[in-house]
Amino acid sequence: MKKKVLLLLGPNLNLVGIREKSVYGEVNAETIEDNVKKYGESIGIEVTVFQSNWEGALIDEIHKAHTVYDAVIINPGALTHYSYALHDAIKGVSIPFIEVHMSNIHQREEFRHKSVTAPACVGQIAGFGAKGYELALSYIAETEL
């Protein structure tokens, strides 16, 4: 049976390819999302993408996720650093989450070094650009969840 994975993207990730190209690169968000879906298909995973700039909308998707998906790949954006509500929502559902960041958050501004959401996740991938989403999918494909 094909695994189903939600790619959950937080605030400002719709602007990838437009903002801070030196950090996030020049490939736009839509292309990255399409590439992640194609990669998922190639390894037997159906990927659905949801992006929102609103914390509550992300929490609502997390609440729904456990009845639909086998796992969630989450890039909470800046919410990573302070959203205990996202942390609690992740802990509140019984499916694995993998936190992914395109940039290496530990090489950036000091306030970005701490993730309050990562402790609620199976693991964190950071610093490999959009390839990080594929790395997370590979882990999900190779692991009994």
Located regions from the model:
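Extreme N-terminal starter segment of soluble prokaryotic enzymes
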Residues: 2-5
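Short glycine-rich anion-binding loops that position phosphate/pyrophosphate groups of nucleotides
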Residues: 11-13, 77-80, 103-105
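Glycine- and acidic-residue-enriched helix-capping/strand-helix junction motifs
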Residues: 16-30
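Short beta->alpha junction loops
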Residues: 48-56
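Short acidic active-site motifs
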Residues: 57-61
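Short acidic/histidine-rich motifs immediately flanking catalytic phosphotransfer sites
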Residues: 65-72
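Short, acidic/small-residue loops that bind anionic groups at enzyme active sites
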Residues: 91-108
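Short, glycine-/small-residue-rich phosphate/pyrophosphate-handling segment
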Residues: 107-145
